[in-house]
Amino acid sequence: MQGQKIRIRLKAFDYRLIDQSTQEIVDTAKRTGAQVRGPIPLPTKKERFTVLISPHVNKDARDQYEIRTHKRLLDIVEPTEKTVDALMKLDLAAGVDVQISLG
């Protein structure tokens, strides 16, 4: 796997879960001898929703909700076979979305 790099993008609603998962990936990659660049925090996406709480009139009565999507980016440079095997066996938290690309 000389000259390749693995790019890992993580997404989660809870920043504690994403930071914990990122730390597990970094520790695993460093333990197997790969060089890690990151974690790079990407901009947080904020989605806001406004809901009328009155069943009939009173347009002034509203509730506002927000969902924040936290993102992190990791690059693993010059991964070894041991690195790939260790990352495949890694068990991350259920609330974290992981996208892996080879480049």
Swiss-Prot record:
Alphabetical UniProt keywords: Ribonucleoprotein, Ribosomal protein
Matching SMART domains: Ribosomal_S10 (SM01403)
Matching Gene3D superfamilies: Ribosomal protein S10 domain
Gene Ontology molecular function: structural constituent of ribosome; tRNA binding
Highest taxon listed in the record's lineage: Bacteria
Description of how the protein assembles with itself and partners: Part of the 30S ribosomal subunit.
NCBIfam families: PRK00596.1, rpsJ_bact
Family: Belongs to the universal ribosomal protein uS10 family.
Protein name: Small ribosomal subunit protein uS10
Gene for this chain: rpsJ
